[in-house]
Amino acid sequence: MEQDVTMYQGFADTYDRLMDEIPYDAWHAYILELLRENQIEDGIVVDLACGTGAMTSRLAADGYDVIGIDLSAEMLEAARDKCPDSVLLLQQDMCELDLYGTARAFVCVCDGMNYLTELEMLRQTFEKVFLFLDQDGVFLFDMKTAYFYEHCLGDQTITDNREDVSLIWENAYDKETGLNEYLLTIFAMVDEERQLFERTEEYHVQRAYPLQDIMELLQQCGFQADVYEACTKETPSAETERAYFVAHKRPA
């Protein structure tokens, strides 16, 4: 089962400018803390759905041998500009992950897992990660919750108007299916002298899952897992907007 390869094509060039409020520094500090708690201070770390390389580049600066994986060639091009040459960037579908060896850890931030809109897609990804993860390795990922989609996004239209780029984000959330659909319309300046802007549109779909369903699926795939409120060690509440899963591959 494959993901949609068309997402983040027109968005890649402007993603970092429009998403400059994403708290990557806080997420990175949390991820680094979890890695070190699990005695992973060096070696190979795989960044799934790495996008433009915001987390990838930070982990590389920490001294890890980082592999960044994303479905979008355009996002990987942006990541190449941001990451040192030592970082290996691969265009792959997470559901069909294929590596030459194992890694000490896998990470996936900024709701990359929410793009897997069927449980079977998540199962395939979890099984692949388990296969390529070292014994005693750790799989760290976040997911947005149903509460976030329903109460923070909902059926809103969000606009962001900058000097050289503008965004219209039309959002629609279906509580019954857990599917969150959004249409992005981007106007990006292509000629400053003539004030010419190029319009592109992208359609994205994410899905919210009950946290317990994810925990059970991780266990079915062989992991021992915990789930926390984002950037804490607290148990998620009914109003948690983003949860972090910490999944271990333990010897049988």
Predicted regions and their residues:
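Conserved class I S-adenosyl-L-methionine
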Residues: 1-41
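C-terminal lobe and adjacent flexible extensions of AdoMet/dcAdoMet transferase-like proteins
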Residues: 207-252
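Residues lining the SAM
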Residues: 109-111
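A short glycine-rich, Lys/Arg-flanked "PGG" loop and its adjoining helix->strand segment in the class I
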Residues: 123-135
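SAM-dependent methyltransferase
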Residues: 140-215
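Class I SAM-dependent methyltransferase SAM/SAH-binding core
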Residues: 46, 53-96
